[in-house]
């Protein structure tokens, strides 16, 4: 039996009873440089196919590469932020393989002399514990082109009638970050994988070296998974699940592979060393191709490029450009806001921290900003099936809503209607309020007093309770007035008027 012939998945608890999961993460990051790694072609995302190419990135005879200094700077800054040692002598190498999206039939990468080695990244798990992920290396390379397979049901080459090639991406600068073996996590292995990619994304975003858009492929994660029988010392055969394109999918893919491989082993089969593709629709993986070894790529030094030899002075200069790193920033903000570890974890896990920070910077209080992003806006994101940051509302607009509430123009209920209008593309909150005056809180006490008197007259028993000192009974009257005013009144002011009327 092979990996392809796997029976039903093994229960997760049964997997953990017999096997120790072993992971290795490889993350490719497209650098946000204006030009490609070895030529002056632009790197703009979404351009018309094959409009950002030249003889160098197409591998035409006689063309020679030139190293992009900005890409080297970004690679060194990434290595420093990951606590790596920066090599004083890094060499490019040719990685030889044939594939249609590789126009030269080799990729310029780094092999045994990468730009950065031996680092670590401490990641915070859901319960607040810290897990150290050791970094093996970070190396520079160029991206491949992009294949579009037409006519098949899956978008892959199998079953396609023909394929199209876009070489705009060929030669875009990449840094590949490779971890050392991640073991000992047990049941939390999928969580550790997701937490690592999350922390790495946040770090890279803070360095401003990439937009780290997993949905657009500027950050691509490959998850290597193997199982080792409990008590064994020899690692199992690994599979590599390619291009997992969301944080949630990282966790799902690792968990699925653990269960699938265990099912193969328990049925007497052997896990095949292969690449696999994650299926977003159902959370499964499907077989790709047999996984090559380093020897298969026949690496040798790139003869057209000199080694990269950053001086100690340049490295220290770049170290001085590192921003406040995410974990330092979070600790400072937590102290400034006076919130608990649990609150900060919830903000991070919800993907809301940067949004809340930006909303506070735009003028809202931390409590109000946090409330909007983790409650109503989180609900809207869930309903729309998008990430919180993808909602069509900005932190500045949320801060405007908070300001309108603080000024008394809106109450919390009506403010949600204003946010709905903003989400529908009707402009900033102030513009929405100007276009919908019926949403503004009623401030005319004469009208409110009339509504209060009407509600009290309709509920004489409750009015009597209030007169008898049972102030809590006023809630029913306040609710009736809010209903009568279609939510446009200030509940606090209505309650004051109710108590005055019964005094």
Curated annotation (Swiss-Prot):
Tell me which EC number(s) this protein carries: 6.3.5.-
Role this protein plays: Allows the formation of correctly charged Asn-tRNA(Asn) or Gln-tRNA(Gln) through the transamidation of misacylated Asp-tRNA(Asn) or Glu-tRNA(Gln) in organisms which lack either or both of asparaginyl-tRNA or glutaminyl-tRNA synthetases. The reaction takes place in the presence of glutamine and ATP through an activated phospho-Asp-tRNA(Asn) or phospho-Glu-tRNA(Gln).
Q: Does the keyword Nucleotide-binding apply?
A: yes
Q: Which organism is it from?
A: Rhodococcus jostii (strain RHA1)
Pfam short name (any one): GatB_Yqey
State the SUPFAM superfamilies in the record: GatB/YqeY motif (SSF89095), Glutamine synthetase/guanido kinase (SSF55931)
Q: What quaternary structure, including any partners, is listed in this protein's UniProt entry?
A: Heterotrimer of A, B and C subunits.
Please identify the protein, giving its name as recorded.
Aspartyl/glutamyl-tRNA(Asn/Gln) amidotransferase subunit B
Under Gene Ontology molecular function, one entry of this record is: asparaginyl-tRNA synthase (glutamine-hydrolyzing) activity
Q: Does the keyword Transferase apply?
A: no
Q: Kindly state which reaction or reactions the protein catalyses.
A: L-glutamyl-tRNA(Gln) + L-glutamine + ATP + H2O = L-glutaminyl-tRNA(Gln) + L-glutamate + ADP + phosphate + H(+); L-aspartyl-tRNA(Asn) + L-glutamine + ATP + H2O = L-asparaginyl-tRNA(Asn) + L-glutamate + ADP + phosphate + 2 H(+)
| InterPro entries linked | Asn/Gln-tRNA_amidoTrfase_suB/E, Asn/Gln-tRNA_Trfase_suB/E_cat, Asn/Gln_amidotransferase, Asn/Gln_tRNA_amidoTrase-B-like, GatB, GatB_Yqey_C_2, Gln_synth/guanido_kin_cat_dom
Family statement? Belongs to the GatB/GatE family. GatB subfamily.
Query: What's in the keyword line of the UniProt record?
Result: ATP-binding, Ligase, Nucleotide-binding, Protein biosynthesis
Q: Which GO terms describe its biological process?
A: glutaminyl-tRNAGln biosynthesis via transamidation; translation
Query: PANTHER family per the record?
Result: GLUTAMYL-TRNA GLN AMIDOTRANSFERASE SUBUNIT B MITOCHONDRIAL AND PROKARYOTIC PET112-RELATED, GLUTAMYL-TRNA(GLN) AMIDOTRANSFERASE SUBUNIT B, MITOCHONDRIAL
User: Its encoding gene is what?
Assistant: gatB
């Amino acid at each position: 039996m092979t990996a392809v012939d796997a029976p039903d998945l093994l229960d997760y608890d049964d997997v953990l009873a017999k096997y120790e999961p072993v992971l290795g993460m490889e993350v490719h990051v497209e650098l946000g440089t204006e030009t490609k790694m070895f030529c002056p072609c632009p790197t703009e995302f979404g351009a018309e196919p094959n409009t950002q190419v030249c003889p160098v990135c197409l591998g035409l005879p006689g063309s020679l590469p030139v190293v992009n200094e900005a890409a080297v700077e970004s690679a060194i800054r990434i290595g420093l932020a990951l606590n790596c040692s920066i090599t004083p002598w890094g060499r490019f190498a040719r990685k030889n393989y044939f594939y249609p999206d590789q126009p030269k039939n080799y990729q310029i990468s780094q092999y045994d002399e990468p730009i950065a080695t031996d680092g670590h990244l401490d990641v915070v798990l859901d319960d607040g514990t810290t897990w150290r992920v050791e970094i093996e290396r970070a190396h520079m390379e160029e991206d491949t082109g992009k294949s579009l397979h037409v006519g098949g049901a899956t978008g892959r080459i199998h079953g396609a009638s023909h394929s199209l090639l876009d070489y705009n991406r060929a030669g875009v600068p990449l840094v590949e970050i490779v971890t050392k073996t991640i073991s000992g996590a047990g049941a939390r292995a999928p969580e550790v994988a997701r937490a690592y990619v999350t922390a790495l994304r946040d770090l890279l975003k803070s360095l401003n070296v990439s937009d780290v858009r997993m949905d657009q492929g500027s950050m691509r994660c490959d998850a290597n998974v193997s199982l080792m029988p409990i008590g064994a010392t020899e690692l199992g055969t690994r599979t590599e699940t390619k291009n997992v394109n969301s944080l949630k999918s990282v966790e799902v893919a690792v968990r699925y592979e653990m269960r699938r491989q265990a099912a193969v082993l328990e049925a007497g089969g052997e896990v095949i060393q292969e690449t696999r593709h994650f299926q977003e629709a159902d959370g499964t993986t499907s077989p790709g191709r047999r996984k090559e070894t380093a020897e298969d790529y026949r690496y040798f030094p790139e003869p057209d490029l000199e080694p990269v030899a950053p001086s100690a002075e340049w490295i220290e200069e770049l170290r001085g450009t590192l921003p406040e790193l995410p974990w330092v920033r979070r600790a400072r903000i937590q102290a400034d806001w006076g919130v608990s570890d649990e609150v900060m974890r919830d903000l991070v896990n919800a993907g809301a921290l940067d949004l809340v920070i930006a909303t506070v910077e735009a003028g809202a209080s931390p409590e109000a900003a946090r409330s909007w992003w983790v409650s109503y806006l989180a609900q809207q994101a869930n309903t729309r099936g998008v990430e919180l940051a993808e909602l069509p509302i900005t932190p500045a607009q949320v801060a405007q809503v908070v300001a309108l509430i603080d000024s008394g123009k809106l109450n919390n209920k009506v403010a949600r209607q204003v946010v709905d209008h903003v989400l529908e593309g009707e402009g900033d909150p102030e513009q929405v309020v100007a276009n919908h005056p019926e949403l503004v809180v009623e401030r005319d006490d004469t009208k409110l007093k009339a509504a209060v008197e009407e509600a009290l007259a309709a509920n004489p028993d409750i009015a009597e309770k209030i007169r008898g000192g049972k102030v809590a009974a006023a809630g029913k009257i306040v609710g009736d007035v809010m209903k009568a005013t279609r939510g446009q009144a200030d509940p606090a002011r209505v309650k004051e008027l109710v108590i005055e009327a019964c005094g």
